[in-house]
């Protein structure tokens, strides 16, 4: 299911789109039907391959992984975003997002995060949305604060080291 915001359409990553993204920007552009920012992701193909593996195991997880944010005026893929899987049994889901450099500082990161948040809270199972950031003030921490997330703790992630955990409970 697409998520639509004022300036964006967030297109869920299907197995076809994820396979195309892994093959390269030209393949992704053709599969999406939109121009692709050359530096739309800073994370490489590993997260896309992981998502593809999860969707291959069970298509019912679709809508709870990667989304491709399209800028509606420019008709261009400007980053990536999504969830780290379906809500847990106790109703928690994690969001993540990135915006390519040429589209930063325009409110689009906030718009992406808010779209993910609204979509998550529209699901009756979701009670809590979390996010993680580097342990310093940065654009992502500003976005989360703007959306009423609270920094709840500092944790040590096996891959990223020390990170901050943010939470927002369903209103």
Regions found by a protein language model. Name each.
Residues 144:
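Conserved active-site tyrosine of GNAT-family acetyltransferases
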Residues 131-141:
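Conserved beta-strand-loop-alpha-helix junction that forms the acyl-donor binding cleft
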Residues 107-110:
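Glycine-rich acyl-CoA binding loop
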Residues 1-94, 99-102, 115-119, 123, ...:
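GNAT-family acyltransferases
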């Amino acid at each position: 299911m697409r998520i639509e915001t004022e300036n964006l359409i967030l297109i869920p990553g299907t197995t076809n789109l994820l396979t195309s993204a892994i093959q390269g920007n030209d393949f992704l552009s053709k599969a999406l039907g939109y121009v692709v920012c050359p530096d739309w992701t800073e994370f490489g193909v590993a997260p896309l391959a992981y998502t593809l593996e999860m969707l291959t195991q069970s298509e019912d997880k679709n809508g709870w992984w990667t989304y491709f944010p399209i800028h509606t005026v420019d008709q261009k893929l400007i980053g990536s975003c999504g969830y780290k899987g379906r809500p847990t049994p106790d109703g928690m889901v994690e969001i993540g997002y990135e915006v390519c450099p040429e589209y930063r500082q325009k409110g689009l990161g906030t718009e992406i995060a808010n779209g993910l948040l609204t979509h998550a809270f529209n699901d009756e199972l979701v009670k809590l949305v979390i996010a993680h950031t580097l342990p310093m003030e940065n654009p992502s921490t500003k976005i989360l604060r703007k959306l009423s997330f609270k920094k709840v703790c500092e944790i040590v992630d096996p891959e990223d080291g020390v990170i901050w955990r943010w939470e927002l409970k369903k209103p």
